[in-house]
C-alpha cells in the first residue's frame, strides 16, 4: 500500500484539507467523507486484506466535499481503504480501515468512546491523548459526542480547526464510525432551528434520518437512532426548536413522540440515549435552578423509565458525574430518597472494593432496573462544582479534571470507564443484563464419564478445583460438588455430580458374545483405543486384538448405553 501524507496531502496542487471520517456505518455499508482544496473526482478503493484493492467507488463529477458510499459489504468484517488522487498517487496506509457493524442482535463485543464539550485548548488535546494511551492498539468501533462539539460560533472554520484537525491525529476518525450530538454552542451563530441547512454541524455530518441503520425514521439529523449489534442507540436534540416550533421538553413535540415510538419499537437488549442537556447535575450548572433542565427532567426520565433505557449520556455541565441506577425521580434534588429511587445500592465498580458488585438488570423483571445517568462535559471544558455538590443521585462526581467516557458491551455485559488526561481510569462500573444464574443442580454420571461444566457469566472465574476458565472438563471418580464464583464472590454456581460405583472387572469369558450397535474402547487413562460404529459382537476375535491389561468398553445395546471393564491376557 502506498503511504503519502502527513496531516494534509498535496499532490500536483491537489490537497486533502480534511482527512477521511466515517459516517452511516452499518452491517453492509459505510460513507467515507473527506475534503480537498480543489474540485477532483471522488474515488475510494477498498480491500479486504490491505494488499489487493479490487473494488473502486467513484463519482462522475468533481467535488471538494467528498462523500463516497461503500456498499455490498459483509457484517463484522474488516476492510482497508485508500483515496485516489491521481493515476499513481493515493492517500492511505495500513491504519486506514474500518470494521462493519455486527448483525442486528449479535452478541459480539464492541467498544464506544464518547466525549462532550470539547472546548479548544490543551485540555481537549490532552483528553484525546489520554484516551489513546488508555486504548493502545485496541480497535474502537464507535465514536459518540455529547454536544458542544465546537465553541466560538459553530462555524465550519471552528469545526475544521477544533474538531477535525484534532481528532484526525491518530486512528479515531479514519477507523471508528462517528455519531455526534448537537449542543447549544453548535448553534451559536445560527437560528436555533433543527436541520437549519446553512449550519456547519448539519453540513459536516451525514446521519440516519430514514431508519437506514435500524430504528424509526426521524426525518431529522438533529435526532436519530441506529442499531449496533445488540444495542439500540438514540441521539436527541435537547436544545433547539423542531419543525413544529417546539423543543423536546416543551410538551408533546414531534421529537418526543418519535422518541416514545422508537423506544417502543426496538427489540434490542441494550438501550443507550445520548444528548446534551443533563437532567441531573450539580456541576457548572444546577439542574435544580436552570429552567430548561427542570423542564427536561420532568419529561425525559419518565420516558426512559417506562421503556427501560439502560444508559443516558449527557454533557453541558463541565464536570463528570455518574449515578447509580435511578428510578422514578423527577423532582428537585431535595426530593431524592435513596430508599425509593435507588433500586440497587452497590457502587457498581466491580473492583473488589466494599459493596462494589455489578448492577443486575432484567428485561423480564424490571423492578430492580434503573437508568444510569452520566454527565460527561469535560472533553476540553472544565469548571468548579456547585457548593452543594454532589447531586444526591450520583455515585461518583468529579470537578476540575478533563476526561472522556468509554464503554464496552459484550453480550449481556456492559463495562464503562471514565478516563482522565493521563489515560488513568478514575471511575468505572459494570452492568449485567439477563444474567440468569443457574440454580444448584445435581447430575449422575458413570464412573468413567467425562463432563463439561460452564459458568453463566462473562468475566473471571474461580472454580473449586482451581481452574480459572469459563468451561471446565472434569472426570470425577467419586461424588463431588464443583463450585464456581467470580473473584469478588458476587456470583456463585454449583454443580453436584453423583458418580455411579466403578465397574467390576470381568473376565474375558464373561464378556463374549455380547451384541452391540456401536462400541468404543478406552484404556484406563481415558484414551480411545478402538471404535466400532456398526453392529457387531464382543467376542474372542475382537478381544484378541486388544493389548493385555484393563479396558473400558462403552457400547450401545437396544438403544441404551452400557459399559463394562475387562481384563485381557494374551488370548
Where in the sequence are the language-model features?
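Acidic, histidine-bearing metal-coordination/catalytic regions of metal-dependent phosphoesterases
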Residues: 13-114, 119, 133-137, 271, ...
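A short beta-strand segment in extracellular, disulfide-stabilized domains
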Residues: 31-33, 448-456, 512
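Extended active-site neighborhood of metal-dependent phosphoesterases/phosphodiesterases
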Residues: 78-93, 97, 156-267, 286-294, ...
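C-terminal tail/sorting-segment detector
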Residues: 89-97, 503-508, 531, 546-571
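Residue-level detector of functionally pivotal "anchor" positions at catalytic/ligand-binding pockets or at interdomain
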Residues: 434-442, 490-518, 523, 569-571
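Solvent-exposed loop segments of extracellular immunoglobulin-like
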Residues: 456-462
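Solvent-exposed segments in extracellular or luminal domains encompassing
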Residues: 470-483, 542-543
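Short, glycine-anchored, charge-dense loop/turn motifs used at functional sites
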Residues: 521-529, 551
Amino acid at each position: 500500500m502506498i503511504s503519502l501524507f502527513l496531516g494534509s496531502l498535496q499532490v500536483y496542487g491537489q490537497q486533502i484539507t480534511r482527512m477521511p471520517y466515517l459516517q452511516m456505518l452499518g452491517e453492509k455499508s459505510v460513507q467515507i467523507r473527506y475534503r480537498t482544496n480543489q474540485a477532483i473526482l471522488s474515488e475510494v478503493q477498498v480491500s479486504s486484506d490491505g494488499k489487493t484493492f479490487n473494488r473502486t467507488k467513484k463519482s462522475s463529477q468533481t467535488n471538494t466535499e467528498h462523500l463516497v458510499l461503500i456498499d455490498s459489504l459483509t457484517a463484522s468484517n474488516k476492510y482497508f481503504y485508500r483515496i485516489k488522487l491521481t493515476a499513481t498517487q493515493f492517500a492511505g496506509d495500513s491504519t486506514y480501515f474500518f470494521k462493519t457493524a455486527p448483525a442486528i442482535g449479535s452478541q459480539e463485543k464492541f467498544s464506544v468512546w464518547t466525549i462532550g464539550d470539547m472546548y479548544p485548548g490543551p485540555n481537549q488535546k490532552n483528553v484525546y491523548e489520554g484516551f489513546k494511551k488508555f486504548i493502545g492498539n485496541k480497535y474502537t468501533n464507535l465514536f459518540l459526542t455529547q454536544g458542544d462539539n465546537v465553541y466560538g460560533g459553530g462555524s465550519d472554520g471552528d469545526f475544521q480547526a477544533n474538531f477535525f484537525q484534532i481528532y484526525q491525529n491518530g486512528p479515531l476518525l479514519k477507523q471508528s464510525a462517528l455519531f455526534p450530538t448537537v449542543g447549544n454552542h453548535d448553534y451559536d451563530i445560527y437560528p436555533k432551528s433543527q436541520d437549519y441547512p446553512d449550519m456547519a454541524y448539519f453540513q459536516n455530518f451525514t446521519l440516519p434520518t430514514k431508519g437506514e441503520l435500524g430504528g424509526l425514521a426521524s426525518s431529522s439529523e438533529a435526532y436519530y437512532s441506529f442499531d449496533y449489534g445488540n444495542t439500540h442507540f438514540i441521539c436527541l436534540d435537547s436544545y433547539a426548536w423542531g419543525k413544529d416550533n417546539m423543543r423536546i421538553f416543551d410538551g408533546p413535540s414531534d421529537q418526543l413522540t418519535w422518541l416514545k415510538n422508537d423506544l417502543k419499537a426496538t427489540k434490542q437488549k441494550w438501550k443507550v440515549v445520548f444528548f446534551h442537556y443533563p437532567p441531573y447535575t450539580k456541576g457548572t450548572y444546577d439542574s435544580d435552578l436552570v429552567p430548561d433542565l427542570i423542564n427536561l427532567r420532568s419529561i425525559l426520565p419518565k420516558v426512559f423509565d417506562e421503556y427501560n433505557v439502560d444508559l443516558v449520556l449527557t454533557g453541558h455541565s463541565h464536570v463528570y458525574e455518574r449515578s447509580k441506577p435511578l428510578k422514578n425521580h423527577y423532582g428537585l434534588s431535595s426530593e431524592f430518597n435513596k430508599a425509593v429511587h435507588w433500586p440497587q445500592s452497590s457502587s457498581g465498580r466491580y473492583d473488589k472494593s466494599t459493596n462494589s458488585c455489578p448492577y443486575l438488570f432484567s428485561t423480564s423483571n424490571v423492578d430492580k432496573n434503573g437508568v444510569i445517568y452520566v454527565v460527561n462535559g469535560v472533553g476540553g471544558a472544565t469548571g468548579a462544582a456547585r457548593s452543594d455538590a454532589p447531586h444526591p443521585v450520583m455515585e461518583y462526581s468529579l470537578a476540575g479534571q478533563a476526561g472522556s467516557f468509554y464503554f464496552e458491551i459484550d453480550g449481556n455485559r456492559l463495562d464503562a470507564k471514565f478516563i482522565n488526561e493521563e489515560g488513568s481510569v478514575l471511575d468505572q462500573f459494570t452492568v449485567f443484563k439477563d444474567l440468569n444464574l443457574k440454580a444448584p443442580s445435581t447430575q449422575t454420571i458413570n464412573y468413567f464419564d467425562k463432563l463439561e461444566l460452564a459458568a453463566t457469566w462473562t468475566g473471571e472465574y474461580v472454580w473449586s478445583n482451581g481452574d480459572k476458565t469459563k468451561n471446565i472438563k472434569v472426570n470425577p471418580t467419586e461424588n463431588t460438588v464443583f463450585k464456581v464464583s467470580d473473584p469478588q464472590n458476587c456470583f456463585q454456581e454449583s454443580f453436584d455430580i453423583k458418580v455411579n460405583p466403578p465397574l467390576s472387572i470381568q473376565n474375558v469369558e464373561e464378556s463374549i458374545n455380547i451384541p452391540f450397535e456401536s462400541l468404543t474402547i478406552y484404556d484406563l487413562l481415558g484414551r480411545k483405543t478402538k471404535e466400532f460404529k456398526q453392529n457387531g459382537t464382543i467376542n474372542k476375535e475382537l478381544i484378541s486384538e486388544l493389548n493385555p491389561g484393563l479396558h473400558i468398553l462403552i457400547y450401545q445395546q437396544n438403544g441404551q448405553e452400557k459399559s463394562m471393564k475387562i481384563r485381557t491376557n494374551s488370548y
